[in-house]
Every structure is written in structure tokens, then in C-alpha cells.
UniProtKB/Swiss-Prot annotation:
Disruption phenotype: Male sterility due to delayed tapetum degradation and aborted pollen wall formation. Reduced amount of total monogalactosyldiacylglycerol (MGDG) and digalactosyldiacylglycerol (DGDG) in anthers. InterPro entries: AB_hydrolase_fold, DUF726. Keywords: Endoplasmic reticulum, Hydrolase, Membrane, Transmembrane, Transmembrane helix. The gene is STS1. The chain crosses the membrane at residues 306-326, 333-353, 355-375, 466-486. Interacts with PKS10/PKS2 and 4CLL9/ACOS12. Residues 34-71, 154-185 are annotated as: Disordered. This is Transmembrane and coiled-coil domain-containing protein STS1. Its EC number is 3.1.1.-. Belongs to the TMCO4 family. Residues 175-184 have a biased composition (Basic and acidic residues). Residues 59-69 have a biased composition (Low complexity). GO terms for cellular component: endoplasmic reticulum membrane; membrane. It comes from Oryza sativa subsp. japonica (Rice).
């Protein structure tokens, strides 16, 4: 395999991915950082709770490797997440089962340090050549980070960086609380100080692992038969979560991993375009050899050749400038290309921007969400349309964000709340049943401006009404009468949201997102659409790899009587429930559920693996989410692996204090 990693290091790389996969699955049901003691007990709980029955013993994987309980583990062969990676890394097949058992054992975290030390070992042979190649790759990552450039912190990092690579000492920007995040990440036997400050080797490791995760790998006939019904091509959300955790172990900022994703996507597209142009009728084996040789981390990529090809699918001015700035350094390190060659290619990149349709990454075929016709109509849903938002389209992004409003006064409100949020996802908004959403939102607004509502607000009755609801007190008759005309519109909107959720699930199952991990974020009825989508995905097996993260804001979803655990299992990474105890409008409109079953948008929910974030300080009414969504998302720090435990009020006080100084 064309990589700078030795066979032993490739073995360690596969082991680290396996360990990260297992730890990430544990964190689905044991909220990371929620317990600072009895880590081993937590890990064993995570091991058993992921099985469908929730029960089971504490026997190790080595003595129970064939049991049905182990089939639920992401590291099990039935999920197809590890063995294709092992094959790509050319790890001896005799070692595969041992790696899987090590990852599944309750002592897995104690192996992490040993495997990391192997990764950073130098064997003395050709170490100079390897260092040059790894440095070239790290430089390529730096260039890509600059082109992503929507993060002010990245700019500060570049200004303060050393000559070799952007510093990555703050990969976990801030830990949740004063305790070391090592304990919370399952590496309590290892401190980050034990990891060598070899940024170049870290980039080579992450590049190799990502390449292995997304490559279309040849398999045996038996595996091919099973893959056709069970495995999906593309980038599995569970792989991305595991790489996010591994990046945290390595203290690598996530934007660097995003840069590597773009590089791999563009390299793959360049290889595909070259293959298409040559019109070769190559055998699967020769295609595989070509992919390994040139499509990923081959010599061309590591010496800069393929890195230049990447510019074809990017917004060229920024990245061309980056190549121009780095040309002298890279030219010295890679005489084959030369400084003038880099400068010339950087200039050329500015004139051919967008010539490579990298939006077709892994099956999106250019059209993707926006180019597809509406999914099969369900019930009476008349409108269900994806619209691109932001500047990250046709940029080789390997992750997608779908943003869903559920409270709107005009069509712009389906887009406006999400415009200011800066992220490197390829983002889309879902505009659905706008007629009904606007109707119910307007009805609520009209009621708020009525004489009765104004009088009640003047008397401070609204918050006491909500308190009364939670205590199951009787409602004032005047208030009930005033909300009658809202109820019918709300009932219709609830019905449409449930059906839209099923349609969203169908879109994801069809792979219209390009077989890339999806982040789902929605507020109000949009949050309900997402929840119902997850429930629909949970009805059939093997759908755990589609959705990476979920954020529900002000969700009109009952706490009891809904399959929260099943929905949680469909999300590989973080699942956040954002609520406001002062959202009395949600309580009024969904009062029947609130009285008997609780309501996620108003209170914390006790579901293993779900983060609860109280935003009462920002949201004093349901419509507040329209203006507060961006600030809430920034507070959640979704690109960190661990949950955010700092209350919003405390975070604001800290910010105010910093400004005051």
C-alpha cells in the first residue's frame, strides 16, 4: 500500500480505529463526561446496553465472540465497518479477529496508549524520505485549512503557527469542567503529554484511515453477496464519529480532519475522472490497484501532485493564494515539482475553478438532494423541497447538514435562522408544508397580540400557567376558549410533520445525500420532523450509519410514549435536546401531551446518551428560536466530540467578563 506507515503502524492504525468505534458506541448510551468515576463500570454498562434486550452478562468478547449480543457491536463483522478497512490497510487477515476482540473487551481503553506509541515509532529505515512525504501531506492539509477559512480561530492559529504545520495543541478547545478530558474520553491511563508532537505523522495516520473508510473496496464473493443487502457504499456516520474521537485523542483540531476529507474526496474524484476519460474497461482488481496507487495517499499525493489536482473543484482564489504562499517551501522539499511548478499550478487553479464536479462525491451525482424529485408522497403532504444554503456546495465536502424550521411567518424563515451559522458542512434547508407552518405560526402570533393575551401577559400569568401545566392544575376557561382556533391548525401541522419525517427517512435511505454522514438540526415542528425520521429509520435494521448528529430545539415531542431509545440508536454521534422552561406557547399548543406525558421542548429528558441543554435565558417564547438558533448552535460546539455541560448563562457571563476586561 502506498503510504508512509509501516506494516506494524498500519496494524496499530486499524486497532485505533476499532477502539475508537467501540468507545463511540459506548458513548451512545453512556453520556460522555456524565460520570467521572467508576469508568470500568460505565464501559461495561455501555457494552451491554447497546444490545436490543439491554441485558446480558459481563463476559469478555474473547469468550463470547459468537454470541448474539456481540452482533450489536459496531466492531462486529456483521456491520462491515472494520474488516474492509483492515483489508485496505493490508493487515494480515489472521490478526483481524484479535483486533475486533481487543476493541470489544472492557479493557480496550488500556490499549490505546500502546498503539499510539507504535504509530509514532521511527524504524530508522528511510525515515528521512518518510518525513519529507509526511511533511508534504501536512502542508497540503494546512493549505486546505486556509481554504476552508470560515473560522476566525483558524486565522489566529495560522498567524501563530510554526513553519512545519498549524499547531494542534488546542484540538479540544475547552473541556467540560475542570477535570481532565482524558478521563472522559476513555484514555485515563494516558495523558496527551505522552503523545509525541509529530503533527506530520498524525496527518498521515488520519489520511490513511479516512481513505480506508471511504474507499470502494473489493471483497470476496461471499462478502459481496452479503454487502448487497447489508452494507452501503460511501462514508459511514459511525466511521466519522470514530475519526472525530481519534482526532481528539491525537489533539488534532477538527478543521484539519475536515481538510483531509476534502483532499480525499477530490483525490477520489480526480481518479474517477481520469478513469472515465481513459474509458478503460478495467477489471475490479486493476481498479483497486489504481485507487491504492494514485487515488489516495500515493506518492503523487504525498509529493504534491494530487494536491494540486484538488484545486479543480474548489473556490480557487483562496486555495490558489495558499499554494502560492507555500510554493517556495514545498518546492524546496519536493524538487520534482519545483517552486515555479507550484506557483504555475496555483495560478492555473484560479482559472479552472469548479471544473471538477466534486459535489458528486460518493454517489450524489451532482443533483443530490436539490436535483431529485420529491420523495414518494405520503398522505397529503404537498411541499417537501431541499434548498442549498451557504457556500460549501461543489466543494468536495464529505458531510451534509439538513436544517429544518418548524415555526415561520414567511418563507424566508425556513432559511433565515440558519444563515449566520458557520460550519463546513454542505448544508441544505428543508422547506416543507410552508402553508400550514405559516398558518399555525400566524395564528399563534395573532393570539399573542389579542387583548386577552396582552392582559394575561401584563398580569404575569403566562409563566404561572406553564407552572400550572407542569403541576397538572386546571386551565383558566378564558385561556382555553382563546386557543380553540389555534388547535385545529396545530393538529394539521403535527400530522404533516409526522409524514414529512417519514419522507425525510426515505430520502436518506435512498442515499440522495450522496452516501455521506448527515447532521440533522431543527426547531419547533422541524425538530419533530427529525424525530419522526429517526423513528422511521429505526423500523428497519442496519440504518445506524446514516445520521451523525442531531439537535432538537423546542421539540413538540412527548417525553413518554415515544421510542426515544430507538431514535437515539439511529444517531452515531451527539444527540442534543435543547429546551426552555419558559416556552409556554409550546405548552399551550401541545398541552394534552404536556399534562400526561411531558414535553421535550420544555424539560430535560432522561434518555441514556441524550444531552439536555437549557436555553431558558435565550428563549422566552417559541418564536425566539427564529432569532436565537445561531447563538444556541455556537454554544453547543457541535464540532467537539464531548457534550457541552457549561450552562448558557455561565457561558454568557464568561464572554461578558472577557469583553469587560
Amino acid at each position: 500500500m502506498a503510504t508512509t506507515l509501516t506494516p506494524t503502524q498500519r496494524y496499530a492504525a486499524g486497532a485505533l480505529l476499532a477502539l475508537a468505534l467501540r468507545q463511540a458506541q459506548i458513548h451512545q448510551s453512556v453520556l460522555l463526561g456524565a460520570h467521572h468515576h467508576h469508568d470500568d463500570d460505565d464501559e461495561e454498562q455501555g457494552r451491554t446496553s447497546t444490545s436490543s434486550g439491554g441485558g446480558g452478562g459481563s463476559s469478555s468478547s474473547s469468550s463470547n465472540s459468537g454470541a448474539g449480543a456481540d452482533a450489536d457491536l459496531w466492531t462486529h463483522d456483521s456491520h462491515g465497518l472494520l474488516r474492509p478497512v483492515f483489508r485496505f490497510l493490508e493487515i494480515d487477515p489472521k490478526a483481524w479477529s484479535g483486533l475486533e476482540e481487543t476493541a470489544a473487551s472492557s479493557e480496550a481503553k488500556h490499549h490505546i496508549g500502546a498503539f499510539l506509541r507504535i504509530i509514532f515509532e521511527e524504524d530508522g529505515e528511510s525515515s528521512s524520505d518518510r518525513s519529507v512525504q509526511e511533511l508534504a501531506l501536512a502542508k497540503g492539509v494546512d493549505v486546505m485549512v486556509m481554504s476552508l477559512g470560515n473560522d476566525s480561530e483558524v486565522g489566529n492559529t495560522i498567524k501563530g503557527g510554526d513553519q512545519d504545520a498549524l499547531p494542534s495543541s488546542s484540538g479540544t478547545d475547552k473541556s467540560p469542567g475542570e477535570s481532565s478530558h482524558d478521563d472522559q474520553l476513555g484514555i485515563n491511563k494516558l495523558t496527551l503529554d505522552d503523545i509525541p508532537a509529530n503533527n506530520h505523522r498524525k496527518m498521515a495516520l488520519l489520511f490513511a484511515l479516512l481513505s480506508a473508510c471511504v474507499a470502494d473496496k473489493p471483497v470476496s464473493q461471499e462478502e459481496e453477496d452479503r454487502k448487497s443487502t447489508r452494507f452501503r457504499k460511501g462514508y459511514d456516520a459511525r466511521h466519522r464519529v470514530a475519526l472525530r474521537l481519534l482526532s481528539t485523542w491525537l489533539d488534532v483540531k477538527w478543521i484539519k480532519m475536515e481538510a483531509i476529507e476534502v483532499m480525499v474526496a477530490c483525490s477520489a474524484m480526480a481518479a474517477a475522472k481520469e478513469q472515465e476519460q481513459s474509458q478503460e474497461s478495467a477489471s475490479p482488481k486493476s481498479k483497486w490497484e489504481k485507487w491504492k496507487r494514485g487515488g489516495i495517499i500515493g506518492a503523487a499525493a504525498l509529493t504534491g501532485g494530487a494536491l494540486l489536482a484538488i484545486t479543480g473543484g474548489l473556490a480557487a482564489p483562496a486555495i490558489a493564494a495558499g499554494f502560492g504562499a507555500l510554493a517556495p517551501t514545498l518546492g524546496t522539499l519536493v524538487p520534482v515539482i519545483g517552486a515555479s511548478g507550484f506557483a504555475a499550478m496555483a495560478t492555473a487553479a484560479g482559472s479552472v475553478a469548479g471544473s471538477v464536479a466534486v459535489a458528486a462525491s460518493f454517489g450524489a451525482a451532482g443533483a443530490g438532494l436539490t436535483g431529485s424529485k420529491m420523495a414518494r408522497r405520503i398522505g397529503s403532504v404537498k411541499e417537501f423541497e431541499f434548498k442549498p444554503i451557504g457556500e460549501n456546495h461543489n466543494q468536495g465536502r464529505l458531510a451534509v447538514g439538513i436544517l429544518i424550521s418548524g415555526f415561520a411567518f414567511d418563507e424566508d424563515d425556513f432559511c433565515r435562522p440558519w444563515e449566520g451559522w458557520q460550519d463546513n458542512l454542505e448544508r441544505y434547508i428543508l422547506q416543507w408544508e410552508s402553508k400550514h407552518i405559516i398558518a399555525v405560526s400566524t395564528a399563534i402570533q395573532d393570539w399573542l397580540t389579542s387583548r386577552l393575551a396582552m392582559e394575561l401577559m401584563k398580569q404575569g400569568a403566562m409563566r404561572t400557567v406553564l407552572s400550572g401545566l407542569l403541576a397538572a392544575f386546571a386551565w383558566p376557561a378564558t385561556l382555553l376558549a382563546a386557543t380553540d382556533f389555534i388547535d385545529s391548525k396545530w393538529s394539521v401541522a403535527i400530522d404533516r410533520s409526522d409524514k414529512a419525517g417519514k419522507m425525510l427517512a426515505e430520502v436518506l435511505l435512498k442515499g440522495l445525500q450522496g452516501n455521506r454522514p448527515v447532521t440533522l438540526i431543527g426547531f419547533s415542528l422541524g425538530a419533530r420532523v427529525i424525530f419522526k425520521c429517526l423513528q422511521e429509520l429505526a423500523l428497519s435494521s442496519d440504518n445506524e450509519g446514516l445520521v451523525e448528529r442531531v439537535v432538537l430545539l423546542g421539540a413538540p415531542v412527548s417525553v413518554k410514549g415515544e421510542r426515544w431509545e430507538a431514535a437515539r440508536k439511529m444517531v452515531a454521534g451527539r444527540f442534543v435536546n435543547v429546551y426552555s422552561t419558559d416556552d409556554w406557547i409550546l405548552g399551550v399548543t401541545f398541552r394534552a401531551s404536556l399534562l400526561t406525558q411531558g414535553l421535550a421542548g420544555i424539560q430535560a429528558i432522561d434518555v441514556p446518551g441524550v444531552e439536555n441543554v437549557d436555553v431558558t435565558e435565550l428563549v422566552d417564547g417559541h418564536s425566539s428560536y427564529l432569532s436565537a438558533a445561531q447563538q444556541i448552535l455556537e454554544h453547543l460546539e457541535l464540532n467537539t466530540y464531548y457534550p457541552v455541560f457549561v450552562p448558557l448563562s455561565a457561558a454568557n457571563e464568561e464572554t461578558d467578563g472577557t469583553v469587560a476586561q
